[in-house]
């Protein structure tokens, strides 16, 4: 009954029912580790609701959706769907495809060195190495200059790859570092779900990067962990970068 009353899809619960029936001891252990909704209830209490967009932004988005509907009707349903869920549509934005991690990371580092107002980074993996060493110097220098620097990274994605000493160095110069869903807080449950797999960088609200590239040497093929690494991303310049 406990599993049945848990929030979630019935198909998800059915898998747990079958596992508990076939192997009760193993099923109970696995449910205790990964199956419950305790973390689902815990995380919302520690997150803040994203502020609503100003009305002017919403109005510009509606105008952009109307324009898109007329010019590219096939995309109108997608645009309207996103807007209904508070994802606004922006115009006046150029998009550059970056086919390799080395290209994206080089581009990101060069743009970060020119930041004047802020640098925001959110990544699943921030791994110490040549890429990080170069980026860290820029982030610390910019923080000393008064540029707002904020970093969010996933704790599980950085186990043994991003040290406490590095975090201390960043915080000493004014960089705000937030660790998403720290693993040590859930060691009794070993929750490996609810990770932050985003790879987003935003610089001054004018330039943004996203895609499949984390900040780690293997993504630039400086080191080889799993063979030649092929991942890509995009650079947005303009209103959409905000």
Each predicted region: which residue ranges?
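N-terminal localization/anchoring segments of enzymes in phospholipid and broader phosphate metabolism
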Residues: 1-242
């Amino acid at each position: 009954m406990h599993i049945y009353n848990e929030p979630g899809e019935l198909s998800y619960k059915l898998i747990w029912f079958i596992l508990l029936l076939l192997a009760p001891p193993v099923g109970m252990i696995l449910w205790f580790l990964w199956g419950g909704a305790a973390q689902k209830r815990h995380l919302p209490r520690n997150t803040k609701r994203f502020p609503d967009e100003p009305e002017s932004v919403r109005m510009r988005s509606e105008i952009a959706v109307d324009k898109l509907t007329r010019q590219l009707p096939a995309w109108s349903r997608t645009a309207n769907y996103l807007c209904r869920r508070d994802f606004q549509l922006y115009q006046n934005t150029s998009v550059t495809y970056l086919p390799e991690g080395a290209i994206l990371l080089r581009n990101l580092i060069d743009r970060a060195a020119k930041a004047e107002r802020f640098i925001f980074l959110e990544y699943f993996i921030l791994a110490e190495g040549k890429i990080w060493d170069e980026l860290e110097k820029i982030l610390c220098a910019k923080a000393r200059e008064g540029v707002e620097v904020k970093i969010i990274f996933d704790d599980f994605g950085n186990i043994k790859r991003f040290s406490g000493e590095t975090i201390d160095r960043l915080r000493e110069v004014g960089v705000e570092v937030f660790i998403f869903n720290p693993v040590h807080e859930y060691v009794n449950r070993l929750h490996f779900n609810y990770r932050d797999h985003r790879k987003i960088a935003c610089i001054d609200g004018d330039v943004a990067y996203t895609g499949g590239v984390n900040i780690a040497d293997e993504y630039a093929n400086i080191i080889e962990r799993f063979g030649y690494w092929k991942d890509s991303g995009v650079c947005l310049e303009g209103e959409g970068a905000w």
